[in-house]
A protein has these predicted regions:
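Exposed, low-structure sequence patches enriched in small/polar residues
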Residues: 244-246, 378-816
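Short, ordered, surface-exposed loop/turn motifs in non-cytosolic proteins
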Residues: 23-25, 32-47, 66
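Bacterial Sec-dependent N-terminal signal peptides
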Residues: 1-28, 43, 70, 101-107, ...
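A short, amphipathic beta-strand motif
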Residues: 25-31, 58, 95
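Structured extracytoplasmic
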Residues: 101, 106, 110-273, 279-287, ...
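Hydrophobic beta-strand segments
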Residues: 41-45, 71, 109, 140, ...
Length: 816
């Protein structure tokens, strides 16, 4: 992954575009008898995906830098016509359309009728029985080939001083231009796997038995190259790409989003096949244009070609092209070949000469088996299994496993990328990209960081300086050590922390750890907030941190994965929490209580059934866009255990999920509930998450102060609806901005038993909740300049004193 990021960074800052000659065809299309203009006539370059349609006045204009010498003109109810054109110049061709009769079995459709609509309804009616995901059980041998390229690369750049070290790379520029662009490959991988599907249990399993990648051979890369990370099934109503639900052309409600046109019919192996083209009704909707073919008996797709609407409200994607051919096996139509091309730009516009990224993937399915033959027992759960020798296959294996030979250029990519890793400039760039992404500077056996905590400031410490580090896989494959030290120029006290981790297994995880620290901390801060010593916390904070306590903490941890999506974490913790300099611990007589000590055992159970975990060394990432997550924690404080002063029991549950509501976006929610038993002081109660910064926090009450409310019984709900531009896409002024609407509500019900406070009094500004729920509402715009979100937040109640009732908050997010 570091190699891939480094190549993109290096080439992006140094490469400029190239120019190509353009061929243009324009004119007017009219009916041959009445001479009336005909709208929505298809005009395409023959044997390409490049085409257009005539407008309401019958005019058309088609241009390309990679055309063919023939255009085809077609429309339902008219005879198809072809015209030869001259390349690299403007061609003016007016077309007279001649009426035709299209025959569909016993039905004759004449001019003015649309035969595509009843046929489309038949396809929808038979979707379930034709959807491969609905077949009871099947398996297939799958070959996948993936490539990532830098597009619009000029070979003359190899002569520039900065690129001299990479001169050999430019020999691999693709000499075959695709859609008028040149490409320099920077990543190439092949995968052979056995793919299993069980519709009854709605589970998939992929066993990756061979993988060959261009210089990158980690498990994380290997798992991403298989089948389970595509998620494209045309039979689904919506094709999920990140948070965006792209509307399938055979969506059950497709007639609301697409216009369909019957174009042709042919015979294939004794079967009659019809061709239907489609285009979006609203180009700003996340829709496609293209065509599909289907069999007239089963109404199953036999082929599909589609391209994302160029005006769709999807970030960075200039083009997304997908095609699939189906084959008939045992009376079922299943995929044979799939092709996916993604054209990405930082700026999505019509300038085809800008530097960008092109991703290509090809899948070939072979050896289908159904029912008992598909060894259904091998699909007990969703999983990706990587064979231990997957990256060790030799050339003889790959020559036999490939369904077709690699191009000479493709074969050379492996050697090219391996050579890049030896270039000094590459190594330097890779180090800085890793530092930016992970927050640590890699020095070999150790990493220094995180860099964003090197400097910060607060009311107690003044200017705080910190240095820390951790070991890497080069130090040890199973042991990981970490430590840090910090010093404030105001309190003039040294703070420190450190720990060690031991991994019996990284996947599934079995890890034990011991961590200790002597440092200030803010009780009750959101887990989603910037860390207290993050420099951004100092910059974005409305008020300097004052509510800090010195905490001496030692914690032992056992972390165990049982099955996919199910894990436990056991914590044994000793804490010594000192009275804060500005938030002292006081009893009811006003006497200072210097500190409180706790010893507790906590067991957390985590269940995320749709979550996928990627492991790369010590790095662990979780994936699952629409992934429900349940956490259940039981904490027992035992008086006398590790010197604890208190006896208590805590039960806390939280559940989060994201629900697709296509085509009107999606909802996210976070539900938390808990109960605490025991006579304990307020620092051990539930301190509800406030936010005193200008940064919007999705898991905090954004107009609640830190440590403003505490409870021993509580229920809270955070809910947001992201409309993904559903309304603004229909407003002419805003649709070009591609802004997206978001609304939210945050509410909290809590109770505090005033007889169970261990003699502590609340500090100034803290209280318990009354019977009325605390509530905040928010409304905002996201996707401003693709990365900015702005929310107006309204505090509905508990507005006594000088509390802020209305605020405007900002956040950054990077999504499609």
């Amino acid at each position: 992954m570091r190699l891939y990021l480094s190549l993109l960074f290096l080439l992006t800052i140094t490469i400029s575009g190239v120019n190509g000659q353009k061929t243009t065809v324009l004119g007017k299309i009219t009916e041959n008898i009445t001479n009336n203009p005909i709208p929505y006539v298809n005009v395409i370059f023959k044997d390409t995906f490049t085409g257009t349609m005539s407008d309401l006045n019958g005019n058309y204009n088609l241009s390309s830098v990679n055309p063919t010498s023939v255009i085809e003109v077609s429309a339902v109810g008219y005879k198809k016509q072809s015209f030869t054109i001259k390349l690299n110049q403007v061609n003016n061709i007016n077309v007279l359309m001649v009426e035709d009769v299209v025959s569909l079995g016993e039905i004759s459709i004449r001019l003015g009728e649309n035969p595509a609509i009843p046929l489309f309804r038949k396809i929808v009616a038979h979707k379930k029985e034709n959807n491969p995901s609905s077949f009871p059980s099947w398996q297939s041998r799958l070959y996948s080939k993936s490539e990532i390229d830098i597009k619009n690369v000029n070979k003359s750049l190899s002569k520039k001083k900065l690129m001299k070290q990479f001169e050999f790379v430019f020999r691999y520029i693709d000499s075959l231009e695709v859609q008028g662009k040149t490409f320099l490959p920077v990543f190439f991988t092949e995968t052979v796997s056995n793919y299993f599907h069980n519709a009854t249990s709605n589970t998939n399993r992929e066993e990756i038995i061979a993988n060959k990648a261009s210089g990158m051979t980690t498990d994380m890369i290997t798992q991403f190259t298989g089948k389970m990370y595509e998620g494209i099934n045309p039979y689904d109503n919506y094709i999920m790409i990140s948070d965006i639900g792209l509307i399938s052309p055979i969506n059950s409600l497709g007639l609301q989003f697409y216009n369909y046109y019957l174009r042709d019919s042919t015979m294939l192996n004794g079967r009659k096949i019809y061709e239907i083209s489609f285009k979006p009704k609203n180009m700003q909707d996340p829709t496609f244009k293209g065509k599909f073919w289907f069999e007239d008996e089963s109404f199953a797709l036999t082929k599909l070609e589609m391209q994302l609407s160029t005006k769709a409200n999807v970030n960075f994607l200039n083009n997304l092209t997908y095609s699939v051919d189906y084959q008939s096996k045992e009376g079922r139509w299943v995929p044979r070949n799939e092709s996916l091309i993604a054209d990405l730009d930082i700026r999505k516009d019509k300038d085809s000469e800008k530097i960008g990224i092109m991703g290509r993937k090809t899948n070939v399915y072979q050896d289908f088996k159904f029912g008992e033959e598909a060894t259904v027992t091998k699909v007990p759960k969703n999983a990706i299994i990587v064979s231990k020798d997957a990256i060790k296959k030799d050339d003889n294996y790959w020559n036999a496993a490939r369904p077709f030979e690699l191009q000479k250029r493709e074969s050379g990519i492996y050697a090219m990328v391996d050579s890049i890793k030896t270039v000094p400039l590459y190594k330097t760039i890779a180090e800085y990209i890793y530092m930016f992404y992970y927050g640590y500077r890699d020095l070999g056996k150790i990493e220094l960081g995180p860099y964003y905590s090197v400097f910060s400031s607060n009311k107690i410490e003044g200017n705080r300086f910190r240095i820390g580090g951790r070991t890497t896989m080069k130090f040890d494959q199973q042991w990981r050590l970490n430590s840090y030290g910090a010093y404030g120029n105001k309190d003039k006290e040294f703070k420190y922390g450190g720990g060690l981790e031991y991994y019996f297994s990284k996947k599934p995880r079995l890890m034990v750890a011991l961590q200790g620290s002597h440092d200030y901390d803010l009780l009750g801060i959101s887990s989603n907030a910037f860390t207290r010593d993050n420099i951004l916390t100092s910059v974005l904070s409305k008020n300097p941190y004052t509510k800090l306590n010195m905490i001496n903490r030692v914690q032992a941890t056992i972390d165990k994965d049982w099955i996919r999506g199910f894990s436990n974490q056991l914590y044994v913790t000793s804490s010594h929490i000192e009275s804060g300099p500005l938030i002292p611990f006081l009893d009811q007589q006003g006497n200072l209580i210097p500190a409180i000590r706790t010893g507790e055992i906590r067991l957390n159970t985590r269940y995320a059934p749709k979550e996928t975990i990627m492991v790369d060394g010590f790095q662990r990432s979780t994936f699952g866009i629409f992934n429900p997550v349940l956490n259940l924690a039981v904490t027992s404080g035992i008086k006398g255990f590790l010197g604890s002063d208190y006896e208590y029991l805590k039960l806390d549950m939280n559940f989060s999920d994201k629900i697709a509501l296509n085509p009107i976006g999606y909802i996210t929610y976070y539900l938390q509930a808990g109960k605490i038993w025991g006579n304990i002081p307020w620092p051990l109660m539930k301190i509800h998450e406030g936010n005193e910064s200008y940064a919007f926090d999705a898991y905090a009450f954004n107009l609640m102060n830190y440590q403003e409310f505490v409870s021993d019984t509580y229920v809270s709900l955070f809910l947001e609806h992201h409309f993904q531009g559903f309304f603004l896409n229909k407003v002419p002024l805003f649709r070009r901005l591609k802004w997206r609407e978001v609304v939210g509500v945050r509410s909290l019900v809590g109770n505090y038993d005033q007889t169970q406070h261990a003699g502590f009094v609340f500090p100034q500004g803290m209280t318990g909740l009354r019977s009325t729920p605390y509530t905040e509402f928010s409304a905002g715009i996201e996707n401003i300049l693709k990365i900015i979100r702005v929310d107006a937040v309204w505090r509905y109640n508990y507005n006594n004193d000088q509390k802020i009732k209305l605020g405007v908050m900002f956040s950054l997010q990077l999504t499609l």
